[in-house]
């Protein structure tokens, strides 16, 4: 695998800024050297990048994206191709998108559809959170299957959007119990959808439909 040595830059890490050179082999950061140590040790590389005056940072991970998401008769404007290309230009090297499953739909088919959308179309690495619309016996089984066989480690549940994604407290509890057994993480869209729908209807009845009332 090709080796790349990034020299003379300022490395930004969780511990601060460091005058450090970075040796990369393939897609792995192989070593960090204090300034000048790489030369002293006669470290060789296929390509040397002079990053003088620049910051060197790890690739960002965007853990909440919505590529090609259909919702409410509209769709997210970014495709996996355009969205991940923009991400790469901004220094993001991994996204975690939301694979979609609504009431009455099969969880496996929802994940497979998102793989079809993303496969071969991404400029960066990608993974998926799995949205589950309405918890039932089958989706509880599917959660564990996806953890054990499909590499899914997190599930998105909703307290909003009745009839589309909504799960009640009992359903959410059962999903959390299942996640405690299979090691997954539960993420919550924690808005009270039932109350919101009442408020929306009241606003509409009063004619309060300007964007400012959305807040």
Which residues are covered by each model-predicted region?
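Histidine-rich, glycine-flanked metal-binding segment
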Residues: 2-5, 10-58
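Active-site gating loops and adjacent loop-to-helix segments of metal-dependent hydrolytic enzymes
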Residues: 90-92, 116-125, 193-215
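Active-site-adjacent beta->alpha loops and helix N-cap segments on the catalytic face
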Residues: 105-112, 164-175
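Metal-associated gating/positioning segment near the N- to mid-region
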Residues: 51-121, 138
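Short amphipathic alpha-helices and their capping/turn segments at secondary-structure boundaries
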Residues: 41-52, 84, 142-145, 172-189
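Divalent metal-dependent hydrolysis catalytic cores, especially in the metallo-beta-lactamase
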Residues: 82-105, 119-134, 149-164, 183-187, ...
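Extended substrate/RNA-proximal surfaces in nucleic-acid metabolism proteins
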Residues: 139-157, 176
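Distinct, well-ordered alpha-helical segments
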Residues: 107-111, 137-147, 196-203
């Amino acid at each position: 695998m090709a080796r790349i040595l990034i020299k003379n830059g300022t490395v930004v890490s969780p511990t601060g800024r460091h005058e450090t050179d970075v040796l990369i082999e393939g897609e792995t950061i192989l070593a960090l050297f204090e300034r000048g140590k790489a030369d002293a040790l006669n470290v060789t590389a296929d390509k040397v990048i002079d990053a003088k005056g620049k910051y060197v940072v790890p690739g960002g991970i965007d853990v909440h994206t919505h590529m090609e998401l259909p919702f409410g008769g509209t769709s997210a404007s970014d495709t996996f191709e355009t969205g991940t290309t923009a991400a790469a230009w901004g220094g993001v090297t991994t996204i975690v998108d939301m694979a979609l499953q609504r009431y009455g739909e099969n969880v496996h088919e929802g994940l497979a559809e998102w793989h079809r959308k993303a496969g071969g179309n991404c400029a960066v690495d990608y993974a998926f959170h799995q949205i589950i619309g309405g918890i039932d016996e089958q989706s509880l089984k599917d959660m564990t299957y996806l953890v054990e066989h499909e590499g899914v480690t997190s599930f998105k549940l909703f307290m909003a959007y009745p009839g589309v994604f909504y799960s009640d407290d009992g359903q959410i509890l059962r999903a959390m119990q299942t996640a405690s057994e299979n090691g997954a993480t539960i993420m919550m869209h924690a808005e009270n959808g039932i109350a919101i729908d009442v408020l929306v209807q009241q606003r509409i009845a009063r004619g309060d439909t300007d964007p400012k009332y959305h807040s």
